[in-house]
Amino acid sequence: MTPYFMEYYGNPSGHYEYGETSKKAIEQVRRTIADSLGAQPEEIYFTAGGTESDNWALHGMADFHPGGHIITTQIEHHAILHTCEYLEKKGMRVTYLPVDEKGMISLDQLEDAICEETCMISVMFANNEIGTIQPIDDIGKIATKYNICFHTDAVQAYMHLRINVHDMAISMLSASAHKFGGPKGVGFLYIRKDQPIRAFMHGGSQERHMRSGTENVPGIAGMGKAVELGMKHGKEEAAYVKKLRNDT
């Protein structure tokens, strides 16, 4: 990160040497993240972290489907729950699925909750309090069956569990760098290229006009390095954490 604080302090949108260096750096990170997910670089949008990514996913779909129906769970992160509560005040209808004693949702209850107005399913990949890993593959199949957008808050899962957005039929995915060894204040939202959604911030042309504002180049560079290390050492780290769990 240090070179982008000290030496290459250029605006990625600028048409000068330092700006072009910054632009190349963030585009390389975009490609690295895309490769880690089985996605395309143009499907990765940089944000200020998981909370912003979750808000964008929910608000973006609500703006595109006013008065629509969202399905989520009772044990989501507050970035999802509080946003859903806000959207209910704006006319959206939200179903909060219960969970069992292990924190798992029922796939039957999920499918039963789907109606004609359902525009989005948002289920956390791995819970931030109790560690429950939801059946993401099966949820993706249900979402595909009914042609519904499937968003997952993968803040606790990305770089710790295998994720392939294509194989899992994930439409949108939120991640935050500091959950996998990167800096705070930066993250990303994966948006499948055929997924209609409104822009989150308006202004300049950054992030393909979807999330305007000068990019956090040092933060993005740090996140990219954390992804590289995670891809290289992820299996070793997972085995170590599993051993810690089993030995306690």
Regions found by a protein language model. Give the residues of each.
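Pyridoxal 5′-phosphate
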Residues: 1-248
